[in-house]
Amino acid sequence: MKLYTKPGACSLADHIVLRWSCLPFELTVVDAATMKSPDYLRLNPAGAVPLLVVDQWALTQNAAILNYIADTAPLTGLGGDGTARSRAEINRWIAFVNADLHPTFKPLFGSTAYLQEDALIQRSHEDARTKLRTLYTRVDAHLQGRNWLAGDTHTGADAYLFVTLRWAHKAGVDLSGLSALDAFFQRMLADADVQAALQAEGLN
């Protein structure tokens, strides 16, 4: 099993979960140029991460990879407690991060550079930060009295949320007063496997 990851990208979530799973895997850290190379594009025509290769099978998309890892390591609790409700809760939060939080960062990652006017670009950045504050406030409310997003142990949803929180801190998103969210972030930072994943990707 080989995971292709780009430092600090959303693929960090899959990297963390692979370490939580204790499954044997090989890590390949790639850059933007590598992701556009013919060899990489044969595996993932989107030219993006994450990419998980198992034997001759290439799997993309965070939600798919996180669920695959959970199913491949069923005794870890990464897929919940075995009930349909537990798994649905995990996937509800993976979907929230993937469909609501993650895309809201796009202006902050340069998607509005085409506007070519500093004032308009800045406005798009501020709008993104405002929307992200609203979304993270919802997560903070859910985390009150909880350690993890879904159930009694960490899952792929938590790893994915953590990755976006790293982005939020770097992008200047206002997270002040969101105490449960901050406690979650510190809990993740203290995790030995999270630290190992960050170190392996050259992150601090």
Swiss-Prot record:
Disulfide bonds: none
Record-listed glutathione binding positions: C10, V49, Q61, N62, H102
InterPro entries the UniProt entry points to: Glutathione-S-Trfase_C-like (IPR010987), Glutathione-S-Trfase_C_sf (IPR036282), Glutathione_S-Trfase (IPR040079), Glutathione_S-Trfase_N (IPR004045), GST_C (IPR004046), Thioredoxin-like_sf (IPR036249)
Cellular localization per UniProt: Cytoplasm
PROSITE patterns assigned to the protein according to its UniProt record, in alphabetical order: GST_CTER, GST_NTER
SUPFAM superfamilies xrefs: GST C-terminal domain-like, Thioredoxin-like
One Gene Ontology CC term in the entry: cytoplasm
Record carries keyword Aminoacyl-tRNA synthetase: no
Function of the molecule: Conjugation of reduced glutathione to a wide number of exogenous and endogenous hydrophobic electrophiles.
The protein's name: Glutathione S-transferase GST-4.5
Origin species: Xanthomonas campestris pv. campestris (strain ATCC 33913 / DSM 3586 / NCPPB 528 / LMG 568 / P 25)
